[in-house]
A protein has these predicted regions:
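Structural signature of beta-strand start/N-cap positions in the alpha/beta core
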Residues: 13, 37-39, 77-80, 101-104
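Active-site loop/oxyanion-hole signature of alpha/beta-hydrolase fold enzymes
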Residues: 28, 32, 41-82
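Conserved alpha/beta-hydrolase "nucleophile elbow" surrounding the catalytic nucleophile
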Residues: 18-20, 79, 83-88
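Flexible "cap/lid" loop of the alpha/beta hydrolase fold
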Residues: 89-97, 103-131
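Short beta-strand/loop motif that positions the catalytic acidic residue
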Residues: 162, 168-170
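Active-site nucleophile elbow and catalytic-triad environment of alpha/beta-hydrolase enzymes
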Residues: 143-158, 175
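Conserved HGGG/HGGXW glycine-rich cap/lid loop of the alpha/beta-hydrolase fold
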Residues: 6-50
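The conserved SAM/SAH-binding core of class I Rossmann-like methyltransferase domains
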Residues: 15, 41-43, 84, 108, ...
Length: 175
């Protein structure tokens, strides 16, 4: 699968991963800013932006697999990775599976499981997913809602395996 991406600058690779339903364009200002010191690569994940959907179900693990293949195809052995929302979940799963490929990790609004969301947003995601699933019988049309309602599933104990510098950002009013 060939993922679409925006690339600017040179130097140490910095990969930016957007959230559910967004695209690399989400990071337009960050690409411009960080490209003064980094080789910035903002990726459209599978089925987002201009990247094809591909086959099989959407899972955070599949997105992490896609990132590994993308890095190999781009000739990137190791990169700093910044993820926002579901992009942070993908970055975290990637770092847990291939820690040697991550220099530094920045997680903005990540969650270990859907249970990490506040009650009302979690309920909203679950209800929208169930409603979409009942109305639309095509699983490909409900998969973004499924990501929000049912993923990721990261065991808190796994976090102790991270050895790279990690910056976690979360806001008081995050969902």
């Amino acid at each position: 699968m060939i993922l679409n991406y925006i690339e600017k600058g040179c130097g140490r690779p910095l990969i930016l991963l957007h959230g559910n339903g967004n695209s690399s364009r989400y990071f337009k200002k960050q690409v411009r800013y960080f490209s003064a010191k980094f080789r910035v690569i903002a990726v459209d994940t599978r089925g987002h932006g201009k990247s094809p959907r591909g086959e099989g179900p959407f899972t955070m693990e599949r997105f992490a697999d896609d990132l590994k293949i993308f890095m190999e195809e781009m000739g990137i052995e190791k990169a700093d990775i910044l993820g926002f929302s579901d992009g942070a979940n993908i970055a975290l799963i990637f770092a847990l599976r291939w820690p040697e490929r991550v220099g530094r990790l920045v997680l903005c609004g990540a969650n270990l499981s859907p249970d990490g969301l506040r009650f009302l947003p979690r309920l909203s995601f679950k209800l929208r997913y169930r409603l979409a699933k009942d109305i639309c019988k095509d699983p490909k049309k409900t998969e973004l809602a499924d990501l929000a309602a049912n993923q990721p599933r990261i065991d808190e104990k796994w976090l102790s395996r991270l050895r790279m510098p990690v910056l976690v950002l979360a806001g008081t009013f995050d969902i």
